[in-house]
Amino acid sequence: MTKFSEFGLDEKIVKSVNRMGFEEATPIQEKTIPLGLEGKDLIGQAQTGTGKTAAFGLPMIHKIDQKSNNVQALIIAPTRELAIQVSEELYKLSYDKHVRVLAVYGGSDISRQIRSLKKNPQIVVGTPGRILDHINRRTLKLDHVETLVLDEADEMLNMGFIDDIETILKEVPAERQTLLFSATMPDPIRRIGERFMHSPELIRIKAKEMTALLIEQFFVKVHEKEKFDVLSRLLDVQAPELAIVFGRTKRRVDELSRALDMRGYVAEGIHGDLTQAKRMSVLRKFKEGKIDVLVATDVAARGLDISGVTHVYNYDIPQDPESYVHRIGRTGRAGKEGMAITFVQPREMGYLRIVEETTKKRMQPLQAPTWDEAFAGQLRVATEKIQEAITEENLADYKTFANELLEKYDATDIAAAMLKMLAKEPDKTPVHITEERPLPSRGGGGYKGKNGKGGKGGGYRGGSGKGGSYRDRNNSGKGRRSGGGSGGGSGSGGGGNRDRRGGGEQRSGGNKGNYSQKSK
């Protein structure tokens, strides 16, 4: 791996990168940064979470003329969330060079953006619609742009932004450097490369590199009506630090977040129908740890850069395999382990095989925990919390009252009462989740991607679109919920039950199982 100090970047940029805690480049950065510094056009096929913002951002910042008041670089992103995330990262990367970075996007006060544009940003990040709006108002001038980046171009294609992008490209000088990043390479994206780029270099990060090798991937075969109870029990057993639950539709997200809240989990949802202010508020609370479970659609979560996500639950298997890679890419980042669990209805097993072909990794079958196992996991984590308090906390102020209790009650009864207070008993509160049909079975139809092109395999047709860290529900104050944990029983994780796909079926319980250990 190459160190950032070896690329020949401005020393101020290297200082900023080191401040962020990065020393060695990721594969996409190692391949992109030298070409970016040379001014070459390039097409990068890479997923979110591979470090591509720094890959195009570092050469861009290196070439910015600090004395110029012109917009010298433009990044076009499909969503407001991604535009904000990219601008924040560019700000950090350019902190010591003092480059002015601005994000412009819909759903925000345009007059405030106009005032910010008058302060002469040198890098502008924005969504296609809002960039065009500013161009038409003559509040954004692009005649001095030297570097243009199209980020997540395939997603912009899916969202119908290609015409807007072509209009924007005509406003930028022909003599420029253009960098295009896309998870997939459908024909319309290739045509943009042919029409608007000069002999671009192609950089491809292979699927096995994109699938986050540190992510453990499991599937649970479950009927639709049983999904929510299975999700509840998994959350109780595993007690993830931060979790994202993916639903296929906006209605699904609303119902899941409401149902999780009814059962005491600190959960909120995001999807495209929420106001920008609401979406940013939810994301801010999730990043700050005030929300333990974020429920999201694919589009709403695209491009999110949230550290600390330990578990991703695919409540619905995604309609195209690329979306699966994006979903699980929310976890297992920055060298940390993550876990992805996908719920699959019996009629959807063909979809599972196509996802596995895309990721080049076989998912392990997982048996859903029982209510007893979920409760055993709660008790185990409560026990761990007590043990941690005994070894790590200063208990001198409490010993007088503890001795008084011991004079009145048996020590075992006192310990049992503590466990009862800390452990969450199984919550079977009735909830309403509208049942959705499984994805249609396509026996032998082959995989048809977003452009309808045939592929290998049968049974899949892609769509056109795209422990104890929970808050304590039993106590007031700022304490964390003691639920979840290591799982019940003393089983060993790997089971002997084999399904027709082969491989041992993992149990969600088991103190020693690699599946059930509490996330650290």
Swiss-Prot record:
Span of the annotated motif Q motif: 2-30
Biased composition (Basic and acidic residues): 428-439
Subcellular locations according to the entry: Cytoplasm
EC number: 3.6.4.13
InterPro entries registered for this protein in UniProt: DEAD/DEAH_box_helicase_dom, DEAD_box_RNA_helicases, DEAD_helicase_CshA, Helicase_ATP-bd, Helicase_C-like, P-loop_NTPase, RNA-helicase_DEAD-box_CS, RNA_helicase_DEAD_Q_motif
Disruption phenotype annotation: Growth rate decreased at 37 and 25 degrees Celsius, completely stopped at 3 degrees Celsius. No motility at 25 or 3 degrees Celsius. Decreased growth in the presence of ethanol.
Biased composition (Gly residues): 442-468, 482-496
First-level EC class: hydrolase
Motif DEAD box positions after renumbering to this chain: 151-154
Sequence positions that bind ATP: A46, Q47, T48, G49, T50, G51, K52, T53
Family matches, as PROSITE patterns: DEAD_ATP_HELICASE, HELICASE_ATP_BIND_1, HELICASE_CTER, Q_MOTIF
Predominant subcellular localization, coarse grouping: cytoplasm
Record region (Disordered): 428-520
SMART domains named among the record's database cross-references: DEXDc, HELICc
Keywords, alphabetical: ATP-binding, Cytoplasm, Helicase, Hydrolase, Nucleotide-binding, RNA-binding, Stress response
Reactions catalysed according to its record: ATP + H2O = ADP + phosphate + H(+)
Listed GO MF terms: ATP binding; ATP hydrolysis activity; RNA helicase activity; RNA strand annealing activity
Coiled coil stretches, renumbered: none
Residue intervals of the Helicase ATP-binding domain: 33-203
Gene Ontology BP term (one): response to cold
Entry GO CC: cytosol
Superkingdom in the source lineage: Bacteria
Record note on quaternary structure: Oligomerizes, may be a member of the RNA degradosome.
Name of the protein in question: ATP-dependent RNA helicase CshA
Organism listed in the record: Listeria monocytogenes serovar 1/2a (strain ATCC BAA-679 / EGD-e)
